[in-house]
Structures are given as C-alpha cells and as structure tokens.
Amino acid sequence: MQETLTFPADSAVVIIEGVEEPIDTVGAEQTSEIIGKYFALCDSDADWHDVHLPINLSLQAPDGMSISGRATMVRNEEIYISMRVMGFEAAVIYANNDSAYFVDKYHKYYFAESFKALMGSSCLTIGNLQDLLLGRAFAPGQGTVCEESAITLFAEDDNAWGIEGDPESPQGMEWWCIATMDDVPVVSSVSFARSETSQADFIYSDVQTTPAGPVAGIVDIALIDGFKGASAQLKWSIKDAKWNTDKQINFKQPNGYKIITTDQLLRFLGQS
C-alpha cells in the first residue's frame, strides 16, 4: 500500500492521501498508538477464497421473523444463502456484482434486481457486502481499508478508535467504522449515511479468529430511511464454518416462477 501519513504532533488523526483537516485532538502518544492499531488491524486480515457456514437470520422490526440456513460465499464474486424449513430449502438469497435475487421456492416466485440498484446506486461491491456481513473493515468500492487511498484515523474514546472515508470522494455517502484498542484490533461497527435521516449501522460482537482473520459471530443491523426503520440480526456458526474448500455456487434464474416487484417483496417481509 502506497500512502502518505501526515499529522500534527498534538493530533490523534492520521491523514492518508487526501484528507486535510484533523477531526479530533489529543496527545502525540495516543496518535502513535492509533497508527499502530491501524496497521495491526490491516495485518490481522487474511486472504480467503470461499466459506460455507450455518446462519440464523432474525428480522426484528417492524415485524419479527426468524429462519435458519446455510450461506456460501466466494470471495469478491458471489453470495448464496439457502434458508431451510424442516430440512427443506424454502428460499434462496443470491447476489453477485451484477444482480441480486430472492427466490421463494414454496410459493414459486422470485425477485430480481441489479446489485447496484439494490445497494442504492452506491459504489459497494459484492466483496464489500461480504465484509459487512462478516465484520471486516473495508473501503467502499475497493478492498480492505488498507487499500483505500484517502482515509482519516481518529480517536473515538479511550477504548476505541475509528476510520473515516474522505467526505469529498465520489462514493455517494459518508462511511466510517469503529475498532477496539485490543492488541489485535477488531471492528465493532460500520456505518453509512446519505443524510441526517438516512443511515445504516452494522454492530459486531462475538468476534472469533478464523482463517480470514477476525470474523463477527453476531451482526446487528439497523436501517433508517426518513420515517421508516428496520432492524435485523445475523448469527453465524463460526465454529462450523468450512474455509477455502474451493466451494462452487451454481445458481440459475428460476424457470416457471412468477417474478414479483419490490413492493410485493417488502409486503412479504412485513416491511410495508
């Protein structure tokens, strides 16, 4: 990673290519510590090719629903989540960098949308979404935060620090993440905001060590868009995960199924 680190002696901010103003001020000792935590976070991540693991998805608001299944991810390429009821595959969620699908095998209908539209026309990639779901630090539209060319590091409090993207970058949103001050820092939250009334927060807990580095076993998600809100929780069975087995995903658009609209999908999920 090619970067330029510049910071005043009394600032807790590290400026990496492009961010000019510090956003917090503390002593030089904490500044140095935060720099060290940033590089420790970078070092803790590891490359991975694929993972297959159990998942439990709970929709908590505005209505409640819980279902379990298994997820398969191929790094930077695909996500496949098979939701099962009494051992039978009842629904499928699939996404790649081009498209996203929700397939209801019981009622025989499906929803399809471009991945970019589903992400709100932001620059998020399928790899970014994988990191969001696993609790790994990343830079929207790029790879890890260690590959981002314009970020700011800042002091959150005595026990946490953060990474903020360049507000002038063409990403269509603000983003930031908070990490711990542990010897091996872990990401505790990632947030996105388009405005004061439009924000998404991902809160991570039960972080465990894996071949990909630290991964969150529990992901709490809160979405706010104007006067509407939604919340959900993902639980991964990290201990049962199988990493780097060259797992293949063979998803095909359903034949003979009825296609449904976004409004119909939201009604199905109890969000309208």
What are these regions (language model features)?
Residues 1-65, 123, 253, 258-272:
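N-terminal leader/targeting segments and the immediate start of mature chains
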Residues 43-51, 62-65, 72-74, 93-95, ...:
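Edge/loop elements at the starts and ends of beta-strands within beta-rich repeat scaffolds
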Residues 56-60, 86-88, 102-103, 107, ...:
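Hydrophobic lipid-interacting interfaces of membrane-associated proteins
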Residues 115-156, 257, 266-272:
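C-terminal low-complexity, charged extensions that often adopt amphipathic alpha-helices
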Residues 78-131:
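An acidic-aromatic
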Residues 5, 145-260:
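Gly/Pro-enriched, hydrophobic low-complexity segments
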Residues 37-41, 56-58, 64-70, 80, ...:
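Low-complexity, intrinsically disordered segments exposed to solvent
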Residues 65-68, 88-95, 171, 196-201:
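Amphipathic hydrophobic-ligand
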